[in-house]
Amino acid sequence: MTLEELVACDNAAQKMQTVSAAVEELLVAAQLQDRLTVGVYESAKLMNVDPDSVVLCLLAIDEEEEDDIALQIHFTLIQSFCCENDIDIVRVSGMQRLAQLLGEPAETQGTTEARDLHCLLVTNPHTDTWKSHGLVEVASYCEESRGNNQWVPYISLQER
């Protein structure tokens, strides 16, 4: 490896950590301000009714779920809709960290069903101009990725 390649790899890893932290910050803020829609079906309903209010779509999946054909079909349809409506999309791994961020119980004791965290939408109503540092950082990362022909960028949320 050349020095330039080593620096590029180091910069990419640094950027990934920065964007990952921005996504975490954004999700917590969006949930606190009731700007987060959770679940594949709930997200599809919202995008059908008011796609202009959606500013970011997170598609979350871990490696062991990659073979779930139904989920992949849902993701393909959601990605298509997001591209058509100029909604930023990010693929995310680290479902356990995602659940932790959103305050999901560690174990469901059979009393409550865990929420579907595979699709998350961050909304920004037309009457409000909410700008969070996390949203700006993630939007910038998405734009930069599209410039590199990576239409659906990927980040990994790290366990803590």
From Swiss-Prot:
The keyword Ribonucleoprotein does not apply. The gene is GADD45B. Pfam families: Ribosomal_L7Ae. Belongs to the GADD45 family. It comes from the Eukaryota. InterPro entries: GADD45, Ribosomal_eL30-like_sf, Ribosomal_eL8/eL30/eS12/Gad45. GO terms for cellular component: cytoplasm; nucleus. Involved in the regulation of growth and apoptosis. Mediates activation of stress-responsive MTK1/MEKK4 MAPKKK. The keyword NAD does not apply. Keywords: Apoptosis, Developmental protein, Differentiation. GO terms for biological process: apoptotic process; cell differentiation; positive regulation of apoptotic process; positive regulation of JNK cascade; positive regulation of p38MAPK cascade; regulation of cell cycle. This is Growth arrest and DNA damage-inducible protein GADD45 beta. Interacts with GADD45GIP1.
